[in-house]
């Protein structure tokens, strides 16, 4: 419904906001492009101050999606992932296959990216829905050291 895209555009005229959608109707909306968020767009790589998404639950390859979004960020850029309890296991479906509770999301992200990212979050109600919305803010760390090997505990 483009609520978030319009809201972010209303915050400032100093940055551009575009929306992406995989559907063919994406270009029917102002400032929207048709794009699969799993795919890297070389023009966007390393050029974005922030990436916002509320679509991670719709991903068949959520790790790839987050990796792609992180690759689009400038140095000191942030990735904002909106997630609700409706995106958890009980809300998972063919259209929304990634069913992870928001309370588990930091652990999942840490398993995927380890010390490559820093994570913070906040919980609030959005003005267009009457349920808690979790905002996870991810930032790529400049120098990261992995303390855990994937095949064994150290």
Map each language-model feature to its residues.
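Class I S-adenosylmethionine-dependent transferase superfamily signal
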Residues: 8, 55, 69
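Core SAM-dependent methyltransferase catalytic element
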Residues: 111-154
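A short glycine-rich, Lys/Arg-flanked "PGG" loop and its adjoining helix->strand segment in the class I
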Residues: 63-78
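Conserved beta-strand signature within the Rossmann-like core of class I S-adenosyl-L-methionine
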Residues: 75-88
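Class I SAM-dependent methyltransferase SAM/SAH-binding core
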Residues: 1-40
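A short acidic, Gly/Pro-enriched loop at the edge of an enzyme's catalytic core
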Residues: 38-51
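Conserved Class I S-adenosyl-L-methionine
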Residues: 86, 90-121
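A short SAM/SAH-binding and catalytic strip from SAM-dependent methyltransferases
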Residues: 48-63
